[in-house]
From Swiss-Prot:
Name of this chain's protein: Elongation factor G 2
Keyword Lipid biosynthesis: no
Gene: fusA2
Keywords: Cytoplasm, Elongation factor, GTP-binding, Nucleotide-binding, Protein biosynthesis
GO CC annotation, single: cytoplasm
Predominant place of localization: cytoplasm
GO biological process: ribosome disassembly
Subcellular location: Cytoplasm
Gene3D superfamilies, sorted: 3.30.230.10, 3.30.70.240, Elongation Factor G (Translational Gtpase), domain 3, P-loop containing nucleotide triphosphate hydrolases, Translation factors
Domain of life, per lineage: Bacteria
Residues spanning the membrane: none
Function according to Swiss-Prot or TrEMBL: Catalyzes the GTP-dependent ribosomal translocation step during translation elongation. During this step, the ribosome changes from the pre-translocational (PRE) to the post-translocational (POST) state as the newly formed A-site-bound peptidyl-tRNA and P-site-bound deacylated tRNA move to the P and E sites, respectively. Catalyzes the coordinated movement of the two tRNA molecules, the mRNA and conformational changes in the ribosome.
GO molecular function, a single term: GTP binding
């Protein structure tokens, strides 16, 4: 089956923004005007099509990137039909992972800004992610009808805060209650939308006299930006010749695709103004799959290879999202970079070194699905029937294997114990957690070997709260969540010699006799436990020596200060004695444990706490507040640097994990939400005396 739309007319775009900038409403309007959705969905009524999880509608925030397809022929019917694949992305910082994974598979992005709030924290994070994946973008300043709306302030903020070159291709006509429409600077015409038809009808008018001078000023700036795209355009511009509308669009497109400028538009999605012009700009200025560089990967013999976006190339695709659907089970969303794949085809998954057969292929409109028989280069689709695929996996032709660059996901920064309320919940919880971890690579599940508890880890308090909530709603699992916990360790500071351990019971019948003498000394950090047999003359029979080692390992599981595991010690068995009848393995195991615990008490035991490498990215103005706060958390500043591309400052510090709980909330309020941070385990270090004493008291332990 041949493709219906040539690949040059595809646009794979994401719609990204800070929470509450009106991103979901903008997407809804796009679906309405492209004819997919006939009744407008409103987020504040809880009916928006893209926000399809129950929780998203309740909270009014977008959690999951839903993918949908729309077709557009231009607001004046002046284009051949284009196919626009849209990925809606969340704007809450705990869901940054969703934005990151969609950026990886996009060719272009629409950044939605609130005309009053302007460039907000998540906008900066999303901008950095778009820079990382070199995604060309256009800006849509939304909510122009709000009190305090200021299009030009947002234009300045994009330059000041994100060092982006924002080039208005429209300016607003009026603002707040008087917002009527926009001036199209390319055509030099006013566009006014009609309220009665929900913005379906519009007309071109002459620019109001009071705006003419402003429009000319901004048009000159736009033409200058367009002219810098190529030598011929620049020569024409410098010679004082007028550039045609097509030449202006061509120049702006070239520079947008090259990530040199960001065209700016405005409107009010809620009031149905400006969205069709935004659709035209997506076609005019954002790239098709053939306008961006070929995707790179590695062959089986680890040579670099590339795949070009064409149907005649070998099939290659990237799975960018795994979801559990209540009707069809697991859905794998994937972006096809090259080739064609049909229902029933076998694909190879290089990361898992296995083949799988594609079941049904679906194209999604939010959570409404349409079954299709094949997908082509440039398409985004969902597959049913792939068993062992996780987010970030490559799917490819089994005969032409390529492994596309994997997505890198941040390590989780918060952990909590989770316990099922009933035995029935216990079995279901295992299945639920496995499913959720498959869907979300930033969510981890592990079992604490010491307590046997299930520990869940994620990107923030809201992240874990929503996942626990999903366990209840989607899998019927009731669970209680504990407070965040820190894994402390114990070790020793000095060496001790000739510490004796005896386990002797000899009162009638067969007795017990074990006797071991140990030297115990500290090891360098990270060296772990070491056992040395230094017995001479057979005073401890050979067959009992492994039992002494086993007894010491038993004692390692709980130290003498607060029952935390003991690390980095060396134990040498130097002497002992045995009894011909009463000695056995168990007696020597007990003797080894007794000697070792006594050695720990004498060897200046200390508590170790985990230190985290923390990196905070923020605008420079907040650096003093952030560094002051890190110091109060016993943090040690390791360094500072400018973020490449003028995106503020990066502070690196080492901070004890115990001081980092609740940090996301504090950081948000310290920086008006304009900072982001990452945290990963670095090493263990000695806890200060006051901290140790508090922990020991908290565990109800004195020195044993």
């Amino acid at each position: 089956m041949t493709r219906k739309t040539p690949i040059e007319r595809y646009r794979n775009i994401g719609i990204s923004a800070h929470i509450d900038a009106g991103k979901t409403t903008t997407t809804e309007r796009i679906l309405f005007y492209t004819g997919v959705n006939y009744k407008l969905g409103e987020v504040h009524e809880g009916t928006a099509t893209m926000d399809w999880m129950e929780q998203e509608q309740e909270r009014g925030i977008t959690i999951t990137s839903a993918a949908t397809t729309a077709f557009w022929k231009g607001m004046a019917g002046n284009y051949p039909e284009h196919r626009i694949n849209i990925i809606d992305t969340p704007g809450h910082v705990d869901f940054t992972i969703e934005v990151e994974r969609s950026m990886r598979v996009l060719d272009g992005a629409v950044m939605v800004y609130d005309s009053v709030g302007g460039v907000q924290p998540q906008s900066e994070t999303v901008w950095r992610q778009a820079n990382k994946y070199k995604v060309p973008r256009i800006a849509f300043v939304n909510k122009m009808d709000r009190v305090g709306a200021d299009f030009f302030r947002v234009q300045r903020q994009i330059g000041e805060r994100m060092k982006g070159v924002a080039v208005p291709v429209q300016i607003p006509i009026g603002a707040e209650d008087h917002f009527q429409g926009v001036v199209d600077l390319v055509k030099m015409k006013a566009i006014v939308w009609d309220d009665i038809s929900q913005g379906l009808h519009f007309e071109y008018r002459d620019i109001p006299d009071e705006l003419l001078a402003t429009a000319r000023t901004w048009r000159d700036k736009m033409i200058e930006a367009a002219a810098e795209a190529s030598e011929p355009l620049l020569e024409k511009y410098l010679a004082g010749e007028a550039l045609s509308e097509d030449e202006i669009r061509q120049g702006i497109r070239q520079r947008t695709v090259a990530n040199e400028i960001v065209p700016m538009l405005c409107g009010s999605a809620f009031k149905n103004k400006g969205v069709q012009a935004l659709l035209d700009a997506i076609i005019d200025y954002l790239p098709s799959p053939v306008d961006v560089p070929a995707i790179l990967g590695h062959t089986e013999d680890d040579k670099t290879a590339e795949r070009h976006p064409g149907d005649n190339e070998p099939f290659s695709a990237l799975a960018f999202k795994v979801m559990t659907d209540p009707f069809v089970g697991q859905l794998i969303f994937f972006r096809v970079y090259s080739g064609v794949v049909k229902t029933g085809d076998t694909v190879y998954i290089p990361g898992k070194t296995r083949k799988e057969r594609l079941g049904r292929l679906l194209q999604m409109h939010a959570n409404v699905r349409q079954e299709i028989k094949e997908v082509h280069a440039g398409d985004i689709a969902a597959a049913v029937g792939l068993k062992d695929v996780t987010t970030g996996d490559t799917l490819c032709d089994p005969d032409k294997v390529i492994m596309l660059e994997r997505m890198v996901f941040p390590e989780p920064v918060i952990s909590q114990a989770v316990e099922p309320k009933t035995q029935a919940d216990q079995e279901k919880m295992g299945v639920a957690l496995h499913r959720l971890a498959q869907e979300d690579p930033s969510f981890r599940v592990q079992t604490d070997e010491e307590s046997g508890q299930t520990i869940i880890s994620g990107m923030g308090e809201l992240h874990l709260e929503i996942l626990v909530d999903r366990m209840k709603r989607e899998f019927g699992v009731d669970a209680t969540v504990g407070k965040p916990q820190v894994a402390y360790r114990e070790t020793i500071k000095q060496a001790v010699k000739d510490v004796e351990g005896k386990f002797i019971k000899q009162s009638g019948g067969r007795g017990q006799y074990g006797h071991a003498v140990l030297n115990v000394e500290p090891q360098p950090p990270g060296k772990g436990y070491e056992f040395v047999d230094a017995i001479k003359g057979g005073v401890v029979p050979r067959e009992y020596i492994p039992a002494v080692d086993k007894g010491i390992q038993d004692a390692l599981t709980a130290g003498v200060l607060a029952s935390y595991p003991v690390v980095d010690v060396k134990a040498t068995l130097v002497f002992g004695s045995s009894h011909d009848v009463d000695s056995n393995e168990n007696a020597f195991r007990m003797a080894g444990a007794i000697a070792f615990r006594e050695a720990l008490r004498r060897a200046r035991p200390i508590l170790l706490e985990p230190m985290m490498a923390v990196e905070v990215e923020m605008p420079e103005d907040f650096m003093g507040h952030v560094m002051g706060d890190l110091s109060t958390r016993r943090g040690m500043i390791q360094g500072m640097e400018d973020i490449a591309g003028g995106g503020g400052k990066l502070v690196r510090a080492e901070v004890p994990l115990s001081e980092m709980f609740g940090y996301s909330t504090t950081l948000r309020s310290l920086t008006q939400g304009r900072a982001t941070y990452t945290m990963e385990f670095k090493h263990y270090t000695e806890a200060p005396a006051d901290v140790s004493e508090a922990i020991i008291r908290g565990k109800g332990m004195g020195r044993q």
